[in-house]
Design a protein with these regions (language model features):
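N-terminal amphipathic/basic-hydrophobic helices that include classical n-h-c signal peptides
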Residues: 1-19
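Well-ordered, non-membrane alpha-helical segments in soluble/globular domains
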Residues: 37-38, 115-131, 166-177, 215-232, ...
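Acidic (Asp/Glu)-rich catalytic clusters
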Residues: 128-140, 182-187, 231-239, 272-278, ...
Length: 367
């Protein structure tokens, strides 16, 4: 399985100097450091315009800290308990305590409440359509909804045997969120991105956030990671765009693992592409700020074709100049790509967001 979906134009790269290629198109990975969806959507459309094929709402509110709000939601379910007597304060009024299945509780009997993703998407889509009707968002641009893989939430907040027990329960809950979104938003307006971070931690056996990140199923962990993500990709209907954002974490702008090259990113992406029944509309791969070396990008030569490839090589610390160095290093191995940050912009310092967006515009051509 390869190639762009029907009617899609592959990402191109245009010459913008004698010795450098210019990427075409930009992707906003998800979170954007603005207070509300309208500001995010307006600003993104204004600064990036036709470089964007889809615009997210910025993951505002409790989603600002990615999945950290999920324990407060899941913890309301009968049969789920919080670990520890006292709340662990976290920004946005979040309680960061972990979760466990109550003693003697059959996990299959647990009924999780709505997780909050569908409600947020439906609310923000109303803003998006209003702005598009006003002409603030170009016609044809889709509304992007980012969802975490179930593995991220399970591996972050559950422990031991509870992980295997709760996995089918939480997976069903996230698929219900997706189905609500699919029922409420016209498919021709929708793009769904799966945020894939903990999976890379398991592949790399990362310990950057404390303990080693490990799988909880029998057999080769890699095979289980591939099959789980392929199921999620295929849960998105063919008339809805689907993307995958691979990530090495972004807690305080720090990774849980520092990759030497893109080899495991390419290996995982290729396996998921091969295992999925439908094509990926886009694939996003992170590029750490320290890597403007060709060795990091060399594995991209073996990447299976996808509709659009975005390299997360834009960093606030070195702007367009640093992005240009990384573009030059990537070009011999990935002749067609657009640009993005390596993770969401949400955790960037306040006041830096506009500059980051402008960097995208400086280094990427419009469609």
């Amino acid at each position: 399985m390869s190639g762009a979906a029907a009617g899609e134009k592959p990402v191109g790269v245009r010459r913008y100097s004698e010795d450098m290629t210019q990427p075409q198109g930009a992707l906003l990975v998800g979170s954007v450091n603005y207070d509300d969806a309208e500001t995010t959507i307006r600003t993104a459309a204004d600064l990036l315009g036709t470089r964007l094929r889809r615009i997210p709402d910025g993951e505002v509110g409790k989603r600002f800290h990615w999945i950290m709000f999920q324990p407060d939601v899941i913890g309301r379910a009968e049969g789920i308990e919080r670990i520890g007597e006292e709340p662990i304060p976290f920004p946005a009024g979040i309680d960061a305590r972990g979760l466990r299945i109550g003693e003697g509780v059959d996990a299959a009997s647990i009924e999780l409440p709505p997780l909050g993703y569908a409600a947020a998407a439906i609310e923000s889509y109303a803003v998006f359509t209003r702005l598009q009707a006003e002409g603030a968002v170009p016609a044809g641009v889709r509304f992007q909804v980012s969802l975490p893989t179930p593995l991220a939430v399970i591996s972050s907040f559950f422990h031991g045997d509870d992980r295997a027990a709760i996995e089918p329960v939480y997976t069903s809950a996230i698929v219900r969120e997706l189905d609500r979104i699919l029922a409420a938003i016209p498919h021709e307006d929708l793009a769904v991105q799966w945020d894939v971070a903990s999976e890379m931690g398991i592949i790399e056996r990362a310990a950057g956030y404390g303990s080693v990140m490990e799988a909880w199923w029998p057999g080769d962990p890699f095979d289980g990671l591939v099959s789980r993500l392929a199921v999620l990709v295929d849960a998105v209907p063919a008339d809805v765009e689907v993307g995958v954002h691979l990530c090495y974490g972004d807690a305080g702008e720090k990774h849980f693992f520092e990759p030497r090259d893109a080899g495991n990113l390419v290996r995982y992406a290729n396996a998921v592409v091969a295992a999925s029944d439908r094509p990926l509309t886009w694939l996003h791969l992170p590029v750490p700020i320290d890597h403007d070396d060709e060795a990091y990008f060399a594995p991209l030569a073996d990447l299976a074709p996808v509709g659009e490839l975005y390299l997360g090589l834009v960093h606030r610390e070195d702007g367009a100049e640093g992005a240009a160095r990384r573009i030059a290093a990537a070009a011999p191995f990935a002749p067609e790509f657009g640009v993005a940050t390596e993770c969401g912009i949400g955790r960037a310092p306040a006041g830096s967001t506009e500059g980051i967006l402008r960097t995208h515009a400086e280094v990427a051509a419009a469609w």
